[in-house]
Amino acid sequence: METKKMKKHIAIVLALFTAIFFLAGCGSSEPAEKVYLEESEIDAALSDGDSYKGKYINIAGKVFSIDKDGDTVAMQVWYDVENAEQQFIVYTDKELASGVKEDSFVRVDGKITGTFTGENYFGGEITALMIEAESLEIGGYDDIYAPAESTKEVGETQEQHGVSVTLDRVEYAKGEARVYVSVKNESGATASIYTFNAKAIQDGKQFEHQENYEAGYDNDIGDVLDGASKEGVIRFKGLDPDKGFKLTMEAYSDNWEIELEDFVFEIE
């Protein structure tokens, strides 16, 4: 089974590099002006790269496969990283691709050269947008794939019985809002702040915290020992960055004589 799988992978790689070298051989002179895709056109280009051939694109994703042939490096990248969907292929020279590994987040600026068509391990057809990279950045989820498009600095601290909760800031990024919270416990007992159960209300609609395993956020604050501090990130999908919202976090103490109320913040 492993031998068949390896042969299938080799066949895919050979087909991929054949397509790359063919496209390189068919290169034309550079246009006087680069025409970039609008953000709203990316989904369509991922489905039909041939219709956008010759245009330029700035796109980010997560690398899931890397292959090399001489000085040429080809990377298969997920655009929709949470669902491992909408792949595209980036090819460039090994110098530009230096430092890229599987699971790296990359942002690519380059020229669309068409669509690659091949088979996956199960014999099903795959199609992928092909991009000849001119520049390539490597980084983390929140600075390369989903950087903050706007930030609300809050810096509000609330205190109950020696437990202080600070809402530091709210970042609005592609498809999500990230709420940065810190807790300091000087109550004399362990306190628990359940950020995983945090809720937001905006325009009468309730939003639940949603995990993002791809981002690697340190999400839940949970138990905070007496004398300790912790930080966490609460993630919501669907919040309007142009409107305020109310954030509620449950809190408890191991000292039954201390009754902690929910920590509630109003973000304008």
Predicted segment positions?
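C-terminal motif of bacterial Sec signal peptides marking the signal peptidase cleavage site
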Residues: 22-25
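OB-fold nucleic-acid-binding modules
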Residues: 29-55, 133-138
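Terminal connector regions
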Residues: 125-130, 134-135, 139-148, 241-268
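OB-fold single-stranded nucleic acid-binding module
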Residues: 64-145
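Bacterial N-terminal signal peptides that target proteins for export
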Residues: 3-13
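Low-complexity, acidic Ser/Thr/Pro/Gly-rich terminal tails and inter-domain linkers that flank the onset
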Residues: 34-44, 144-173
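Short, surface-exposed binding/anchoring microloops in extracellular/periplasmic proteins
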Residues: 55-60, 64-65, 163-197
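The feature marks short-to-medium sequence segments in extracytoplasmic or secretory-pathway proteins
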Residues: 72-95, 171-174, 184-236, 240, ...
